Design a protein with these regions (language model features):
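N-terminal carbohydrate-binding accessory modules
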Residues: 7-72
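Substrate-binding/catalytic cleft of secreted carbohydrate-active enzymes
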Residues: 69-72, 79-271
Length: 274
């Protein structure tokens, strides 16, 4: 990072304000369907992270954030997805400082509208292509972008989580495309509504695809680089067989890794009645 200092002066050249900022430079691009960062293939050994602490709930402090980053580095985690909402502002500065890649997710999740009794049934889904929702979801995308657009650590803008796909999310995708800020757009929902796969998301994204399913996609004239936005559901005593995914990184350049679900088990400390 570089220390940048912006001086704001009035028409008489009198200093009004000084704005310091830590900025960085990086180049993100897709070449032959492979994502490259500064000329090198991007490999994500990432994690999904909710904002949570057993005693404070979602009201975490910078102390907990720094502990998280320390554990990231100890466990070779190089990326984080802000599932499923923008996080506290200090977290983005800390990821800039620590060199942690970010997938900055927009605050949108509606899988209860198109998944009914565990089955995909999208006859009515939100936001879908409902005109009344369009401006609302674009507003959420704009809030995410305008708040965090200057953070070097953000490589991906994510349109949300498990919200199917329709014209409204396509409009969100177009909003981020119009910013032309050198980042990539991610959205997993097109994997369940393929009619939008050429209109939404610059990466193929899946949740909990098996290694064989990843291999099958990449062996069949794949259209986009592949990112697992959630995989290896590792709550409790699990995470076995992860080498099956890691081996794919060596065989398929288009497989870029992913984000384990999830960082820590979210639990609450309660005191039993005496």
């Amino acid at each position: 990072l570089y220390d940048f200092c912006l001086e704001v002066r009035d028409q008489d050249n009198c200093l009004i304000e000084i704005v310091p900022y830590a900025i960085g430079f990086r180049r993100l691009e897709i070449i032959d369907k492979v994502i490259y960062l500064n000329g090198k293939r991007l490999i994500l050994t990432g994690i999904n992270r909710h904002e949570w602490e057993p005693h404070k709930g979602r009201c975490i402090t910078e102390k907990e954030m720094r502990i998280d980053l320390m554990l990231f580095q100890q466990n070779h985690i190089n990326a984080v997805r802000t599932c499923h909402y923008p996080n506290q502002i200090p977290w983005y500065y800390m990821c800039d400082e620590a060199g942690i890649y970010m997938m900055a997710e927009t605050n949108l999740e509606s899988h209860g509208s198109w998944q009914k009794m565990g089955a995909i049934e999208p006859s009515y889904n939100v936001p879908g292509s409902i005109p009344q929702w369009k401006e609302a979801v674009i507003d959420r995308a704009q809030s995410n972008y305008e708040t965090f657009k200057n953070h070097t650590s953000i490589l991906f803008w994510s349109l949300g989580n498990e919200s199917y796909a329709g014209d409204d999310i396509e409009a969100m995708n177009q909003y981020f495309m119009d910013q032309n800020d050198g980042r990539l757009i991610h959205y997993e929902g097109v994997s369940v509504n393929r009619s939008y796969e050429d209109k939404i998301s610059q990466v193929e994204s899946r949740m909990y695809a098996t290694p064989d399913e990843v291999r099958q996609y990449l062996d069949q004239n794949a259209k986009k680089p592949y990112v697992l936005c959630e995989y290896m559901h590792c709550m409790g005593n699990s995470l076995g067989g992860m080498d099956s995914y890691m081996n794919l990184l060596d065989k398929y350049p288009m497989f870029q890794g992913g984000f384990i679900w999830d960082y820590t088990v979210s639990y609450t400390h309660l005191r039993a009645h005496e």
